Amino acid sequence: MIEFDNLTYLHGKPQGTGLLKANPEDFVVVEDLGFEPDGEGEHILVRILKNGCNTRFVADALAKFLKIHAREVSFAGQKDKHAVTEQWLCARVPGKEMPDLSAFQLEGCQVLEYARHKRKLRLGALKGNAFTLVLREVSNRDDVEQRLIDICVKGVPNYFGAQRFGIGGSNLQGALRWAQTNTPVRDRNKRSFWLSAARSALFNQIVAERLKKADVNQVVDGDALQLAGRGSWFVATTEELAELQRRVNDKELMITAALPGSGEWGTQREALAFEQAAVAAETELQALLVREKVEAARRAMLLYPQQFSWNWWDDVTVEIRFWLPAGSFATSVVRELINTTGDYAHIAE
């Protein structure tokens, strides 16, 4: 299995270095649900601003304030403790009376707004996230500037970030032990983290191998192509390659890579043979995913940050702004820009 730091770069290995997250204010995340609160219902959506506290900690504190069970407070995604983040929590509080959430006090946390909503906010139920990052002590400004321009045009690999695999790769190591011993794992959280790490690592490996080709965006027979911004996909045939290539070049279609698991992967012929060969050595992880009935899926191979802009504060400090769809990692963007340093270089989302 390729180590995350050794995965293939789309724009070549960065020449410069920089400090990511010198302080929490250098990493700002604003959650985008993609919808507004209903204004009625048995749930309350609460938009919070937090700094220095993780999502679960705030959710538990909110439950205590509302005198409800912790399981009655949900969220669409975890946000990093070591960052300034805006996100929505959802509390189930039936009844017509609206609690005064402006009285909720927690160090490092502020309630920005709240409103009634009809449905529970479930994990993953968000459109995306807007990021504002500040990279400090940047070396080789010219190389970084050119990479910023290239990312606007060509995007970045849609790798799962190192944080998906746990501190020191602990989640992936857990998955490997599980696969090798077949010992039942009772802890539901561990099961989820380990299976997710296994599938994500296989996806990363397939993408890394594809990036070694001369033209990563060259459609091949049997590729599974996804409509940009959509989850649906279809299989490319030889008769359609020229037209499909035009649509990929126009970013209307995206080439996908497999999230291996049980069932068919989605590609056929040449593309399927390539994907299978890319992870042929990882028989234990593949067998684990099939055994645990994790359904195979597809994910876009490349990621095009939206609303992408940057501003150099001085020769060694640059602020970068962009929006990513849910499930994508800001660190996969930064990875193509600089070699990061700092205690939290890999801990982003």
UniProtKB/Swiss-Prot annotation:
CDD domains: PseudoU_synth_EcTruD
Keyword Isomerase in annotation: yes
UniProt entry keywords in alphabetical sequence: Isomerase, tRNA processing
Molecular function terms, GO-annotated: RNA binding; tRNA pseudouridine(13) synthase activity
Annotated residues for binding of substrate: F27, N129, F329
Domain (TRUD) ranges: 155-303
Active site feature: D80
Entries under InterPro entries matching the protein: PsdUridine_synth_cat_dom_sf, PsdUridine_synth_TruD, PsdUridine_synth_TruD_CS, PsdUridine_synth_TruD_insert, TruD_catalytic, TruD_insert_sf, TruD_pseudoU_synthase
SUPFAM superfamilies: Pseudouridine synthase (SSF55120)
Record EC number: 5.4.99.27
A cellular-component GO term for this protein: cytosol
Record flagged with keyword Isomerase: yes
GO biological-process terms attached to the record: tRNA pseudouridine synthesis
Functional note: Responsible for synthesis of pseudouridine from uracil-13 in transfer RNAs.
Family: Belongs to the pseudouridine synthase TruD family.
NCBIfam families the record matches: PRK00984.1-4, tRNA_TruD_broad
HAMAP family attached to this UniProt entry: TruD (MF_01082)
PANTHER family membership: TRNA PSEUDOURIDINE SYNTHASE D
Name the UniProt record assigns to this protein: tRNA pseudouridine synthase D
